[in-house]
Amino acid sequence: AFLHDSLAGYYPLSLTERARQISRALHAHLPADYPQAIRLLLASSRVSHARRAAQGMGGFLFMPHMMFIAEHGLDHFEASMQAQHELTQRFTAEFSIRPFIERHPEATLARLAQWTQDPSPHVRRLVSEGTRPRLPWASRLRDFQRDPAPVLALLERLKDDPELYVRRSVANNLNDIGKDHPDLLADVARRWLQNASPERRWIVRHALRSAIKRAEPGALSALGYGAAPTLAIERVRIEPKRLHEGGSVDIGFELHNTGAHSQSVMAAFVVNYVK
């Protein structure tokens, strides 16, 4: 019966629709007692073939588990948090954790603060990725868009994490924050760059990437590009003059420093397309 309900009309469905259908089938066939149901789900994830399947794209096997927790576990905080701690090491709990942030903000943030020191990089990454205000594929965390201070407190604990996997998530979270609070992002960038390791400098530059594209003054200043440049642009060359689909264009020019001192310069091209 479980297989029948899981696979009914399965193949035309999208990835998330398939996972949601399996999650509904789990709810229909697992015990009604949530803690007992979670124990069974976790037991199924611990068998050897499930651990092997969690490698690579096989981790999506556990997407229905996460949906089940998000939809039915909000009234069972401790059991659900323990389950997400274990399952996120097989498939990310960045989506399922968000309803708990909204329903139980203080308790969830306190648990996430503990997890910043967890031995598993998957758990530490969850702290950052799950609190992103604008996480792709997920509903926005509006409270964190208005006031990202609770998120920044967590990111402070992760900014020197030994795993690039975690640091990249920290940078992406800051990039999200900067879309709503550009001045705050610039302030964090300047502070983090003080006596920064190469790894932390990478976080800052990656976090500022969208702000730099928008030419935001605070972001440019944080990276040393704030002053008005004294430059002359000469010998501009664009070849060919006409371009066919699939072709390439070469752009060349010379930049001359017309001032008395050395300066840091960021050059960017603006391309306009005929519509």
Regions found by a protein language model. Give the residues of each.
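Surface-facing alpha-helical segments and adjacent helix-coil boundary elements at the starts of domains
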Residues: 1-219, 250, 261-266
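Proline/serine/threonine-rich low-complexity linkers at boundaries of modular beta-sandwich domains
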Residues: 218-233
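Contiguous segments within soluble domain cores/interaction surfaces
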Residues: 229-231, 258-275
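Long, positively charged binding patches that form subdomain-scale interaction surfaces
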Residues: 237, 248, 260
